[in-house]
């Protein structure tokens, strides 16, 4: 029975890839009629460069992708999908992509409102969280493709060439996929980020919307009613990074992305809360090994981030 399920899952993955190949025959990142869903194909190596992941699921149908968080490399392919349950500063790329072995996949934004509704409904229906689940949400999580996730993704992607079907059935199919994520191997991370006890994820949301202000660790701890010591411990458990390093990485990664988009160094620095351009340049070089100006002229700055 297990072998049969694996065979069916493999066939369904092949069908999903065929659909993406039809929708996106060339390299690129494209929006679909469902605003939460994007398709991508990368046919040349992209080095890992600064990025900020929003709450997202990324499913790979061909090739492999890499994300680095606090020095830890997360490499995933068609055997595992990636769940990022909260906004995180990472380095991301596809160093192995080529015309012969392109990176092909689907990127699905996690709608916080729907994820919260589902997570709380699941907790209410099934009772209290199991003891093993009662830990802070993990940062990046890689999960094995299971039957529910594979079928939900196929049912979602197959809609995309029919605008009427997409408009009418798309929101329901997205909800089905979110439910599969909350049930699957990444359930602990996803349910703790969106369900009861999601203080760290809420703190990160607060920081993301106040990035150009002088947010302190005390501000973040007060936002969720914790002492500084408890907040620091739980934050590092959830993200692997200290709150201070997280704030710095979020600002610098956002600034790096703005520079890559064509902003000047001064504009990027001010946009993420730096009052001193020289301090920004020093911290940028310390983190990335290049000054902002050097980085803006490098091949990395022009790479399309996915």
Give a label for each model feature.
Residues 66, 214, 262-263:
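Residue at a beta-strand N-cap/secondary-structure junction
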Residues 132-208:
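An amphipathic alpha-helical interaction segment
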């Amino acid at each position: 029975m297990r072998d049969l399920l694996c065979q069916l899952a493999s066939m369904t993955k092949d069908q999903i890839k065929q659909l993406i190949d039809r929708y996106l025959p060339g390299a690129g990142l494209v929006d679909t009629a469902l605003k939460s869903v994007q398709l991508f194909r990368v046919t040349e190596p992209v080095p890992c460069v600064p990025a900020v992941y929003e709450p997202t699921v990324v499913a790979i149908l061909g090739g492999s992708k890499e994300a680095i968080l606090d020095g830890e490399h997360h490499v995933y392919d068609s055997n595992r999908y990636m769940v990022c349950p909260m906004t995180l500063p990472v380095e991301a790329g596809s160093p192995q992509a080529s015309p012969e072995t392109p990176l092909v996949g689907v990127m699905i934004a996690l709608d916080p409102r729907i994820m919260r509704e589902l997570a709380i409904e699941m907790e209410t229906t099934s009772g209290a969280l199991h003891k093993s689940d009662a830990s802070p949400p993990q940062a990046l999580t890689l999960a094995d493709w299971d039957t529910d996730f594979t079928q939900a993704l196929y049912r979602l992607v197959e809609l995309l060439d029919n605008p009427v079907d997409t408009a009418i059935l798309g929101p329901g199919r997205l909800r089905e996929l979110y439910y599969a994520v909350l049930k699957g191997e990444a359930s602990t991370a996803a349910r703790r980020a969106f369900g009861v006890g999601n203080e760290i994820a809420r703190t990160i949301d607060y920081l993301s919307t106040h990035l150009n202000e002088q947010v302190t660790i005390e501000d973040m701890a007060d936002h969720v009613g914790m002492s500084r010591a408890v907040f620091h411990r739980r934050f590092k458990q959830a993200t692997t990074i200290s709150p201070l390093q997280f704030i710095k990485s979020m600002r610098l990664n956002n600034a790096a992305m703005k520079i890559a988009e064509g902003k000047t160094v001064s504009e990027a620095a001010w946009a993420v809360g730096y009052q001193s351009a020289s301090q920004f340049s020093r911290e940028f070089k310390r983190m990335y090994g290049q000054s902002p100006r050097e980085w803006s002229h490098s091949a990395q700055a022009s790479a399309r981030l996915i």
